[in-house]
Amino acid sequence: MSLVLAVYGKGGIGKSTTSANISAALALKGAKVLQIGCDPKHDSTFPITGKLQKTVIEALEEVDFHHEELGAEDIIETGFAGIDCLEAGGPPAGSGCGGYVVGESVTLLQELGLYDKYDVILFDVLGDVVCGGFSAPLNYADYAIIIATNDFDSIFAANRLCMAIQQKSVRYKVKLAGIVANRVDYTTGGGTNMLDQFAEKVGTRLLAKVPYHELIRKSRFAGKTLFAMEDTPGKDDCLIPYNEIADFLIQENPLASVPVPIGDREIFDMVGGWQ
C-alpha cells in the first residue's frame, strides 16, 4: 500500500520545486517514489527529469483516448534517484476541466497495475483556488501538505486549502500533515511570524522551514533537484528541511490533523497584527 501525499500551495511560491526536493529526499532514503504533476503547465517534474515530459493527455490524444493502447513507458519518465514521474497535463486554455485530467491519470495508473507499485505517490497540485476538480487528489491522499510563504496572499490561499481538506476529511481519510514554510527570510521577510500564528489558529504546525537561497532558485532553472547540484556553501543547510519532511513522512503513523479553517474576514482582521 502506497503512502499518498497531496501537495498544495499558492501558485508561484516554489511548490513544485519543494515537491521535487521532497520526492528526492524520500527516494534517497530508499523509498520508491512516483511524483504526479497536476498542473496544465506540466513542469512539476522538470527538476527531476531535466525536461518537460509528455503529458497523459498528450499520450491519450495520440491513441484517440483508448487507454488500453498505452503502456507505462508512454506516460512515465524516470529521473533523479530513480524517481518515476508523470505529468497529467491539462485541456487547452479556456476549455475543459484540469481536475478531470487528474482523475484520468489515476485511472490509467490503476489500469496498468502501477498505482500500488510505489512506496510513496506525491501529487503536486495547482492550488490557488481548490475547485472540485483540482481537489480530486485529496480523495486518494493519506496526507495533505501545504506550501506557503510568510505573506498574506499565500496564507489566504492556505486557509482556503484548509477548508478543502476539512471538507474532504468528512468522506475520505485525508489529514493535514502540516505547512512547509518556503523562502524563509529573517532579514527582510519577517521569518515565519505570520505563518506561526496562522498554523496555531487552524490547528496545525510548520513541518519545516526552507530558507530563501539563490541555490534553490538556480536548481530549478538547471532542471535539477537541490540534491543533484554541485556542493557549494549553504547547500547542506538548504537540504536540512527537505530531509526533515521526508523523515517525518516515513515514520510510522506521523502526527496529522484535520484543520479548522478560519473565516476570510478573520484573516483580514489578523493582518493588523502582522505589521
Curated annotation (Swiss-Prot):
Disulfide bonds: none annotated. The keyword Ribonucleoprotein does not apply. Mg(2+) binds at residue 16. Its EC number is 1.3.7.7. The keyword 4Fe-4S applies. Binds 1 [4Fe-4S] cluster per dimer. One of its GO terms (molecular function) is ATP binding. NCBIfam families: DPOR_bchL. Homodimer. Protochlorophyllide reductase is composed of three subunits; BchL, BchN and BchB. This is Light-independent protochlorophyllide reductase iron-sulfur ATP-binding protein.
